[in-house]
Amino acid sequence: DTMTIIAPTEAEKLQTDEWLKYFRYRAIEYFTDPANERKHTGRGNRGVNDVAKQLATIMQILLVKRLESSFTAFTQSLLNLRRYTENMIKMWENDTIFVCPQIDVNKELDYEAKTLKRGKRVSFNDCVEDIRAKITKLTEQGRNEKGQNAEYNRKDFKEEYYIQLKEDFRLISNLYDRWAKNPQDPKFDAFKENIKPELFNPQKNTSGKLVIFSEAINTVQSLARAVKAKGYKALVITAANRDEMEHTIEENFDANYEGVWKDDYNVIITTEVLAEGVNLHRANVILNYDTPWNSTRLMQRIGRVNRIGSKEPFVYVYNFMPSAEGDAQIQLVRKAHTKLQSFHVLFGEDSKIFSEEESVVHYDIAKAVDGEESPLQKYVYEL
């Protein structure tokens, strides 16, 4: 019943109220003063209800994508969402509520991390002062547009908001407790079983190197552990270490590198940070462990190994497809098919990239692809 809780269908919503409403991201819906609402209207004078609903929907989609990525990533995302919801509850109970689109309030309220970093105990009140200082700085710099970054009190919100937050927190906590006890992940098991016989099949993987993409850092870390357990040398790249590891990437995976080639690593496992702007074409096998949010990224990922200068005759692309339940919510398969079909039509591509259905798909391309990117997408990696 996990999907029913995190992303119910309209029919399921009629049968039960036990599903997440993502109220942590809907505070602006509950302002009592219309003047505060006007600070947060969207483009085209969209009301706060529409803005909040869109943000909540993005967080819902992200949670579904984390579930599709790996059970480890999903469980960690539940833990994060529980903490973020608890932060809002704590602000309410302390009568100090921050709504700050330009400030990472959840990061600022992580007093345990701040205590470790500063080497002295940091309290909730210390964190509050940090946020106030950031708001003041934004205002002084003329960057606090319409006063969107502001501090409020309980009286500025409808009382029902607190009740809804508590209900969300209960559902998230119960779901997390269940998933924290679940060691099974069939997708991950299938990956481990196919590392050597399929991904390193010498008849296909003639380069002896492999590129793996995933959007979730927790998934990347799990994949790295599995690859290393099979005896392969894995290089893990995220935004945190991309720059410092650039030379290592070139030495081990760039077929155009003019220096001495190295084989310190035969697998590179990365997030979207390497989806563009880098050569990885000493490898000729790529695995998309999860399908990217923007289907154009799929082509960009594959373009890392399918490049001029490759020494291998063929490139092999493997994809883990989303489940039917998950894709009913995020529609990644449909968007990927549509975008890739448009490439085939426009550029005469004759290689099937995502599935056998590509050459016969005839969706309304403009309708399916339009709106993939959201102005609120900056929030989606929060989980």
Predicted segments — roles?
Residues 217-218, 267-274, 293:
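Conserved helicase core region in the C-terminal RecA-like lobe
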Residues 237-271:
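Conserved helicase ATPase core of P-loop NTP-dependent helicases/translocases
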Residues 1-240, 328-332, 338:
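Helicase motor interdomain insertion/brace
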Residues 294-315:
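Conserved SF2 helicase motif VI
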Residues 310-383:
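C-terminal accessory region of SF2 helicases/translocases
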Residues 201-205, 228-229, 255-263, 278-280, ...:
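Conserved catalytic network of the ASCE P-loop NTPase/AAA+ motor domain
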Residues 278-290, 300, 315-319:
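A short beta-strand element within the Helicase C-terminal
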